[in-house]
């Protein structure tokens, strides 16, 4: 009988110890929540809402954190399911867009098939700004815009895209493609 009492006592102590450890893990999980995942390439230095919040030279606001990652890598991080041709290297941050030069949509993709030929632009102002404005005011929702300048002229053609999964490919020429950045 003493043998069984001793065995039950050891079992009871083990159960109490297990429950105590479980409670400690549960409590620590409540007071120390999981941190946001780190941005690839460089660790976040501080939180931000716009690029002006990032005072370090060459840093931009991506995913709510200041980082020095390249524009192409930032676009891949920021835009869900984006596919970018590895030959595309010319990308610039603008306050509201990732702006790619020598780039067009893959017209075989669902993104490319959503292309709307908005027409020729003969603006005395920046034709890219005009195309961007058309995209911003497009009633069905515009995901990206593309401006293709005719060789040797100040005239060009504006295209709008409505599919939310961009597929970009390299195109040698005076083509500019812009995709909105996530603004917090």
UniProtKB/Swiss-Prot annotation:
Its main location: virion. It is a single-pass membrane protein. Coiled coil: none annotated. One of its GO terms (cellular component) is virion membrane. Induction: Early structural protein. Residues 28-184 are virion surface. Residues 1-6 are intravirion. The keyword Amino-acid biosynthesis does not apply. It comes from the Viruses. It is found in: Virion membrane; Host cell membrane. The chain crosses the membrane at residues 7-27. Keywords: Early protein, Host cell membrane, Host membrane, Membrane, Transmembrane, Transmembrane helix, Virion. Belongs to the asfivirus envelope protein p22 family. This is Envelope protein 169. It comes from African swine fever virus (isolate Tick/South Africa/Pretoriuskop Pr4/1996). The lineage of its organism: Viruses, Varidnaviria, Bamfordvirae, Nucleocytoviricota, Pokkesviricetes.
């Amino acid at each position: 009988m003493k043998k069984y009492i001793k065995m039950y006592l050891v079992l009871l102590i083990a159960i109490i110890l297990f429950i105590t450890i479980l409670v400690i893990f549960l409590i620590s999980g409540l007071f120390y929540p999981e941190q946001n995942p780190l941005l690839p390439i460089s660790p976040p230095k501080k939180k931000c809402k716009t690029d002006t919040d990032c005072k370090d030279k060459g840093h931009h606001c991506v995913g709510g954190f200041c980082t020095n990652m390249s524009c192409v890598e930032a676009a891949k991080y920021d835009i869900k399911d984006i596919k970018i041709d590895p030959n595309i290297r010319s990308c610039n941050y603008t306050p509201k867009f990732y702006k790619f030069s020598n780039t067009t949509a893959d017209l075989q993709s669902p993104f490319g098939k959503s292309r709307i030929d908005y027409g020729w632009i003969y603006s005395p102002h920046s034709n890219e700004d005009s195309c961007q404005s058309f995209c911003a005011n497009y009633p069905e929702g515009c995901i990206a815009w593309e401006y293709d300048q005719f060789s040797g002229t100040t005239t060009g053609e504006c295209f709008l895209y409505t599919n939310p999964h961009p597929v970009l490919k390299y195109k040698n020429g005076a083509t500019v493609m812009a995709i909105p950045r996530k603004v917090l």
